[in-house]
């Protein structure tokens, strides 16, 4: 299948997608009623989009094209209000978090959607297991070559994005010992992890053509890379974050990615090389396992750095870009998070250590999302 031409978009514009959990109180397991909720909400939207994701326990909120994080926050907040009102009327709950802590994948119903049914045919039970919840951030690019450079530049900071957003320590009723267990779900997919190496947009079109030979790839949406170009939107899409427990944290993560993109494309601090990726999966694994306490290994020198320290260095590097984009509040909030040494996975474990149950944890997450 031919690839769309890269749509020219205004650089550094934003789009945010949040995959939300639809919850069935009082047991607080995942519901299978997202279609009912989506049908109730759609007529009330004034901006953005609410749609299905893989299974009937998932709901995706997506902004339109936003110039800055304030506009994105306004759109998401309006959607949040409408969704919560409809959820209350249908006796459902809504929450964030990268995984539901005790749902059973065998119970998950794949949406009655041509694309998802085709994906179920291709991947079998792996699609039901992929009932996990992430945040995706799109950043606008002027052309395809800029998009490829930006993708490679952002790949340096995949561990940082994972650790800051980690919110999936529990799965199938057990503590996984990971800060972010969600990304492990995709390890069996043939396109998991980083995009295969290309150096420019022309090479990318050739890569996509070859991937389409598999008959499993009909569009860019069928590729599960950590970061991927989206030519129809004219963006680069970062896909490694867990869905946060709060809208504020989702906005902060989007602000960081927007500011990092601006810094990368204006300063060009890296000359991308295929060798950059030799330790990519090791560093990614470390971030998933240990969060901000993990250790990064420099592929060229062998130097070892605490991810928390390297994250503070990234925040310092992008501060000026954030100020120009109106995203400095996001950088300030994330800097404070790193200095306090925590993420939402750590909070979840503390809740359980203090005597809470997994059912109580999901109930608490619904209350947090509802602002209670």
From Swiss-Prot:
Catalytic EC class: ligase
Reactions that this protein is recorded to catalyse: L-cysteine + L-glutamate + ATP = gamma-L-glutamyl-L-cysteine + ADP + phosphate + H(+)
Record key words, sorted: ATP-binding, Ligase, Nucleotide-binding
Alphabetized GO MF terms: ATP binding; glutamate-cysteine ligase activity
E.C. designation(s): 6.3.2.2
GO biological process: modified amino acid biosynthetic process
Pfam families hit by this protein: GCS2
Protein's job: ATP-dependent carboxylate-amine ligase which exhibits weak glutamate--cysteine ligase activity.
Quaternary structure, from the entry: Homodimer.
Family statement drawn from the similarity comment of this UniProt entry: Belongs to the glutamate--cysteine ligase type 2 family. YbdK subfamily.
PANTHER family noted in UniProt: GLUTAMATE--CYSTEINE LIGASE 2-RELATED (PTHR36510:SF1)
The protein, known as: Putative glutamate--cysteine ligase 2
Protein species of origin: Salmonella paratyphi A (strain AKU_12601)
């Amino acid at each position: 299948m031919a690839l769309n031409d890269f749509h020219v978009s205004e650089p550094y514009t934003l789009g945010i997608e949040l995959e939300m959990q639809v919850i069935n109180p009082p047991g607080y397991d995942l519901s299978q009623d997202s279609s009912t909720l989506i049908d109730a909400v759609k007529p009330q939207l004034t901006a953005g989009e609410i749609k299905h994701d893989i299974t009937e326990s998932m709901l995706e909120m997506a902004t339109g094209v936003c110039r800055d994080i304030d506009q994105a926050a306004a759109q998401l907040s309006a959607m949040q209000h409408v969704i919560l009102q409809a959820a209350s009327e249908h006796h459902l709950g809504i929450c964030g978090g990268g995984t539901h802590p005790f749902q059973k994948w065998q119970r998950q119903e794949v949406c009655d959607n041509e694309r998802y049914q085709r994906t179920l045919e291709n991947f079998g039970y792996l699609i039901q297991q992929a009932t996990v919840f992430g945040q995706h951030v799109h950043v606008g690019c002027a052309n395809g070559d800029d998009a490829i450079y930006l993708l490679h530049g952002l790949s340096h900071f995949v561990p940082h994005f994972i650790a800051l957003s980690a919110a999936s320590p529990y799965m199938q009723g057990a503590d996984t010992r990971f800060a972010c267990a969600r990304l492990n779900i995709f390890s069996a997919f043939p396109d998991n992890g980083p995009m295969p190496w290309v150096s420019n947009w022309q090479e990318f079109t050739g890569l996509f053509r070859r991937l389409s030979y598999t008959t499993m790839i009909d569009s860019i949406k069928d590729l599960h890379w950590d970061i991927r170009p989206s030519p129809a939107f004219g963006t680069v899409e970062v896909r490694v974050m867990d869905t946060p427990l709060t809208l504020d944290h989702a906005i902060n993560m989007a602000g960081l990615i927007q500011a990092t993109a601006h810094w990368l494309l204006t300063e060009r601090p890296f000359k991308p090389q295929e060798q950059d990726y030799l330790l990519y999966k090791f560093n990614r694994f470390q971030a998933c396992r240990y969060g901000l306490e993990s250790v990064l290994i420099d592929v060229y020198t062998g130097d070892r750095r605490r991810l928390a320290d390297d994250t503070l260095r990234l925040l310092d590097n992008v501060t000026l870009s954030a100020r120009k984009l109106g995203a400095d509040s996001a950088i300030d909030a994330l800097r404070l998070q790193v200095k306090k040494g925590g993420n939402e996975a750590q909070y979840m474990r503390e809740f359980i250590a203090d005597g809470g149950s997994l059912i109580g944890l999901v109930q608490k997450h619904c209350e947090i999302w509802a602002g209670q």
